[in-house]
Amino acid sequence: MRIGLFAVGRLKAGPEKDLAARYLDRFAKAGPAVGLELARLVEINESRAANAQTRKREEAAQLEKTLADGSLLLLLDERGKALDSESFATLLGTFRDGGKRDLMIAIGGADGLDPALHARADAVLCLGKMTWPHQLVRILIAEQLYRAVTILAGHPYHRA
């Protein structure tokens, strides 16, 4: 299964971008052994619309343009379901084994994600109940993707 990462906001050069890239590179190298591959990273600028509802709608339209037909959609949202790393790995394995070719993981902007995306999403997860800046969310999900691959492969990286 091809996994894409969609992010509202761009990472500037620096340690956050380097660390996210390091984990995505590890995921890209280890993933094919368990049937997962990094398809692409899509970054968009935050909308400059006057109100939050319009900003979310504009950002959602950009996301919709990137989705392949029949693609699964996983949203990262502070009101989503919290999973431990093993459960996240299991979810990815279930998605992979379900016959869909593409999964897009979406990181929203400062205003969150449009309700229409929530209605269309196959899963809505959180990385804990705290609010995180998108730079850290990018690092956290990149690391969890790599960790999920190691769990699915039985690699000792994950020691729970």
Swiss-Prot record:
Originating species: Sinorhizobium fredii (strain NBRC 101917 / NGR234)
Superkingdom of the source species: Bacteria
Molecular function as annotated in GO: rRNA (pseudouridine-N3-)-methyltransferase activity
Keyword rRNA processing set for record: yes
Protein's name in the database: Ribosomal RNA large subunit methyltransferase H
Protein residues bound to S-adenosyl-L-methionine: L76, G108, L127, G128, K129, M130, T131, W132
Protein function: Specifically methylates the pseudouridine at position 1915 (m3Psi1915) in 23S rRNA.
Pfam families: SPOUT_MTase
Reaction equation(s) it catalyzes: pseudouridine(1915) in 23S rRNA + S-adenosyl-L-methionine = N(3)-methylpseudouridine(1915) in 23S rRNA + S-adenosyl-L-homocysteine + H(+)
